[in-house]
Regions:
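Structural and coupling elements of P-loop NTPases
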Residues: 1-524
Length: 524
């Protein structure tokens, strides 16, 4: 077995998805605590006098206590190397999450027991389904009042189409949490609170006879539920899990650390290792072939003192070594990897080598774009990174015209990250750009980063546009003659038409079908 194949077998590259406030960032912190990567779990919210979450680094994340940009966290657990791609928790940042899901091999889905499947969770799960990603489910906040677990299992099956197979089952109702039954061993682990969840939770395993006496009717009800689950065949099955047909379900409380170890152990025992990646021709790239990777995220100014630009890549094959020269498939140009890092929140460590499944931050990646394929030896091109079509639009202008140079530099850098698209008028250039995004909060972040990172305070105001379409030069000339339509150009050079009225767009598509008006679909 080659070194690349062996190391790939040790990798577990995954992401956590959830609706905002379901507990994703909390669970991320607790994974790091249990793996020994941090000595004390960071606070999820940035409250005055307490530190913000370890994985949150951007100024706005610290102030608001939400995850806005995804970060790659690496830690070891039970002899495996975990690569956890932290994802934005706010609904307006689903596009960044979408890209992260293109770089992982499995997913942990966090559900609030009081709310069940929520809109953002459902939207992100559809992305998981499109990539056939295995999903582990964690029913969180069971120490608080919530819905019956059997009801939640029905909802999982009905709304997302995965067969839920509980690996642990709760004793007690939500808000009166006594512990869980391990359905494999039959053991009962009693729930014990820890102070603010800052330390690993003690795990008291007691006999079933003792549990029957001490937990009374709560134990009897849990045993009845487990017998029902056994009768309907709702048991964890590795084959159906890896085929994305079933989802192992765990019950716990991330805030108090209960159930965290169960999920980590399942990632080791059941989750897929890094495997061969398919190229655009659907041919697998052998793990032991020349080094290859693809860019799934670009982030500017993670180091304020250097105003740098990092391209995050997922290694797909071979052994990455710092200093090696990779070729970019899109441009055919070489890229020297002199500066390669692992990023842990705002902290960095130099990466000298990496293997399939690993995430590496390539510093000073000014010529790399999201979706770029990199390789050594035999050329390879991996599939494009999917993206959502913009749904909201805004205009931007610098408050101080003397800072226009900084404003323009900020536009270029933040546009290159691909979350907010900067649209420019072909005649006016940077003078009156339109921002296009998936959600409104992205504009607030955009303005904040322009001011903090580029010293270019700006005004961002809503634009009246409702729809966007790709067009061409010939159609653009006709569209310019019609009111309520504006022709702009994306950073990649493609012309787009912005429509103030969806009705007008529909009429044009019907009355003048010869016009080029292509929807901006996933991957374009």
């Amino acid at each position: 077995m080659s070194q690349s194949v062996f190391e790939a077998s040790r990798r577990r590259t995954f992401a956590i998805i959830s609706h905002p406030d379901a507990g994703k960032t909390t669970l991320t912190e607790k994974f790091l605590l249990y793996a020994g990567a941090v000595g004390e779990a960071g606070a999820v919210k940035a409250r005055e006098g307490r530190r913000s979450a370890t994985s949150d680094w951007m100024e706005m994340e610290k102030k608001r206590g939400i995850s806005i940009s995804s970060t790659a966290l690496t830690f070891d657990y039970r002899g495996m190397q975990f690569n956890l791609l932290d994802t934005p928790g706010h609904r307006d940042f689903s596009e960044d999450t979408y890209r992260v899901l293109a770089a992982v091999d499995s997913v942990v889905m966090v559900l609030d027991v009081a709310k069940g499947i929520e809109p953002q969770t459902l939207k992100l799960f559809e992305v998981c389904r499109s990539r056939n990603l295995p999903v582990i489910t964690f029913l969180n906040k069971y120490d608080r009042p919530g819905r019956a677990p059997l009801e939640l299992l029905d909802e999982i099956e009905e709304q997302i189409g995965l067969r839920p197979t509980p690996a642990t089952w709760p004793v007690g109702i939500p808000g009166d949490f006594r512990g869980v039954i391990d359905r494999t061993s039959g053991e009962f682990t009693r729930f014990t609170r820890t102070v603010r969840g800052s330390a690993i939770a003690p795990e008291e395993v007691i006999s079933t006879d003792q549990a029957a006496v001490e937990e009374g009717s709560a134990w009897a009800q849990a045993v009845d539920d487990v017998e029902l689950l056994d009768a309907v065949g709702a048991v964890v099955d590795s084959e159906s899990f890896l085929a994305a047909e079933s989802t192992p379900v765990f019950v716990g409380s991330a805030l108090t650390n209960f159930g965290v170890r169960h999920v980590l152990d399942t990632l080791v025992d059941l989750a897929p290792a890094a495997g061969e990646r398919l190229d655009v021709h659907e041919s697998p790239r052998a793990l032991d072939s020349g080094c290859s990777a693809f860019v799934f995220k670009v982030q500017a100014n993670m180091d304020k003192s250097h105003r740098d630009r990092i391209a995050f890549v997922r290694v797909c094959s071979g052994k990455f070594e710092r200093g090696m020269v990779l070729t970019c498939h899109r441009t055919g140009k070489p890229f020297a990897t002199k500066y390669a890092s692992q990023v842990f929140g705002a902290e960095r460590s130099t990466v000298d080598e990496a293997f399939p499944g690993d995430v590496v931050g390539l510093v000073n990646a000014t010529d790399l774009q999201i979706g770029d394929s990199l390789y050594v030896g035999e050329p390879v091109e991996f599939p494009a990174i999917p993206r959502f079509a913009p749904e909201v639009f805004a205009s931007a202008r610098p408050l101080d015209t003397g800072r226009f140079k900084q404003f323009r530099r900020g536009l270029d850098q933040l546009d290159s990250e691909g979350v907010v698209q900067v649209l420019r008028d072909p005649q006016q250039g940077d003078a009156n750009p339109v921002l296009a995004a998936v959600g409104q909060l992205q504009f607030e972040v955009f303005a904040s980063r322009l001011e903090i990172e580029f010293n270019a305070p700006s005004e961002v105001t809503p634009s009246p546009y409702e729809s966007i379409r790709f067009t061409d030069e010939e159609s653009a000339e006709r569209l310019k003659e019609i009111g309520g339509i504006r022709i702009m150009r994306r950073g990649d050079g493609r012309l787009v038409a912005l429509f103030e009225s969806r009705y007008r767009l529909q009429r044009l598509e019907s009355d003048e079908p010869e016009l080029v008006l292509e929807p901006i679909n996933v991957g374009t």
